[in-house]
Amino acid sequence: MAPRPLHELVEAGWAKALDPVAGRIAAMGDFLRAEVAAGRTYLPAGANVLRAFQQPFDDVRVLIVGQDPYPTPGMAIGLSFAVSPEVRSLPGSLENIFRELHTDLGLPRPSNGDLTPWTEQGVLLLNRALTTAPRKPAAHRGKGWEEVTEQAIRALVARGTPLVSVLWGRDARNLRPLLGDLPAIESAHPSPMSADRGFFGSRPFSRANELLVRQGAQPVDWRLP
């Protein structure tokens, strides 16, 4: 991530929303450059670290919170739960998301794990930590990204426009107090270790659309190619 002004790194609405933590974002850029200088790398690739904030701030109507990027090289693309379209063996969490998508809405299994079409529908796929080290899950948690992503959520809430949050797992549910009176769908994480404890059968996609319509917003078209 090059040392560039925030407005050159993210969409204009996000640049304004994240201005209170611009210093923290710059510090995280310094941290990542220091990692590279020390012979260590990070995921996702630099151009994708802030990718979640490249979709229009004002268009976000659903927030899906993840933990941190997939640590397997070649998978993470800067959107929570999504992987590069070239990835053939999908992570277990994503397989379970697709299974629930079919159960909930009857949609066929997508051809790949790239969730970019959801972002074009106003779905923000946001990890709490935006980077990690290769093959080291949660390596960059507690380094400062949480300050950035929590500010992002506060800014979304402050808009006063329709928003539904989908909180999978304890880490995501810990963000519930930031959401005020806005609706949230909470369940177990889609990980194979926990999906049977409340994720399967939770119908997050249809419920999100129901909650959007109640707020006067258009539902999301959850279909993926």
From Swiss-Prot:
| Localization annotation | Cytoplasm
* InterPro entries tied to this protein: UDG_fam1, Ura-DNA_Glyclase_AS, Uracil-DNA_glycosylase-like, Uracil-DNA_glycosylase-like_sf
Q: Where is the active site?
A: 68
Enzyme class, broadest EC rank = hydrolase
Catalyzed reaction equations = Hydrolyzes single-stranded DNA or mismatched double-stranded DNA and polynucleotides, releasing free uracil
Q: In the record, what terms sit under GO molecular function?
A: uracil DNA N-glycosylase activity
Check the record and name the SMART domains matching this protein.
UDG, UreE_C
Tell me its EC number(s), please: 3.2.2.27
Q: Which SUPFAM superfamilies match?
A: Uracil-DNA glycosylase-like
Alphabetical UniProt keywords: Cytoplasm, DNA damage, DNA repair, Hydrolase
Query: What do the Gene Ontology cellular component annotations say?
Result: cytoplasm
Q: Name one GO biological process term.
A: base-excision repair, AP site formation via deaminated base removal
Cystines in this chain? none
Q: Which PROSITE patterns match?
A: U_DNA_GLYCOSYLASE
Task: Name the protein family.
Answer: Belongs to the uracil-DNA glycosylase (UDG) superfamily. UNG family.
Database matches in HAMAP family? UDG
What is this protein's function per UniProt? Excises uracil residues from the DNA which can arise as a result of misincorporation of dUMP residues by DNA polymerase or due to deamination of cytosine.
Q: Which NCBIfam families does UniProt cross-reference here? A: PRK05254.1-1, PRK05254.1-5
Q: What is this protein called?
A: Uracil-DNA glycosylase 1
